[in-house]
């Protein structure tokens, strides 16, 4: 049984993950001091690393493609990004760069969809759930 918070995080998330490191006792992300960012912008602090979004989408698609082949699945598979995960336009647009469709969760999302369509980021072929 793990008794400290550090041990819990270590066993649950395999921390530190790629990109994170300790530098002179301070947590960094790709060489950037997180303490510096927290002191500058305050907390709570949310960090979004756009290249990771594409990596995770590719990983999920790969898992599904392997399962589809292994099970001789004849249906179609479409990866859908759930907008409630993050409504920030730069995050949704990054996801759309990886040939995804969108899952909406509220009436607020309809405005997002309209803006994305006006910007040419989605079209009539984009599946909206």
What name fits each language-model region?
Residues 1-129:
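A charged N-terminal "starter" segment
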């Amino acid at each position: 049984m793990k008794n400290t918070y550090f041990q819990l995080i270590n066993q649950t998330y395999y921390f530190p993950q790629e990109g994170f490191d300790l530098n002179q006792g301070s947590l960094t992300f790709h060489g950037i001091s997180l303490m510096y960012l927290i002191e500058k912008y305050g907390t709570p602090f949310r960090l979004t690393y756009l290249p990771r979004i594409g990596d995770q989408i590719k990983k999920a698609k790969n898992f599904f493609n392997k399962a589809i082949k292994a099970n001789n699945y004849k249906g179609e598979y479409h990866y859908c990004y759930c907008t409630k995960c993050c409504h920030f336009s730069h995050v949704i647009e990054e996801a759309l760069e990886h040939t995804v469709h969108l899952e909406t969760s509220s009436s607020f999302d309809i405005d997002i969809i309209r803006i994305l369509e006006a910007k040419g980021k989605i079209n009539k072929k984009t599946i909206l759930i």
